Amino acid sequence: MPESLTVLGIESSCDETAVAILRSAGEGKAPEILSSIISSQIAIHRRHGGVVPELASRNHSADLPGVIRAACREAGVTPADIDVFGATGGPGLVAALLVGNSTAKALALATGKPFVSVNHLEGHLLSPFLKRPGGPVPHLGMVVSGGHTLFVDVRGVGDYRLLGRSLDDAAGEAFDKVGKMLG
């Protein structure tokens, strides 16, 4: 494996189109965030009282090329400089996920680079360790995101044990609704 890798990741699981470019700093070291660009659809969906999946996917399709260009410009790279392309593989809105995955796969194919699908919930569980690789393991993780509420025993990357989950309404859903009510 090379000393460092430049990674472009696409997030399109719901109503935000996001692209981040990171450069790894080697084993056990925090990566450098070269760029992180987000295009929010909050104003679009607010008119409908919540996220409309078809609108979300159409807006991802419209926004993603510009968000990728902006992320590359801010990072000072071109798609040819990227070593690995990734995208949120799920869970999320199916059509929205397809937009992000298709785009990342097309870029990977066009540049001859690998593509990696990332589990959205695993991303949430591991995000606190972006700046502190390895972090305290094992630890208890809680994911409160949209329709998901999970309590997870995190043993390491890819090594998780589900301890519990909501059975009906998710805490993430309540969190989102309260946030919407507060503006």
What are these model-derived regions, one by one?
Residues 1-183:
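Short acidic/glycine-rich loops and adjacent helix/strand connectors
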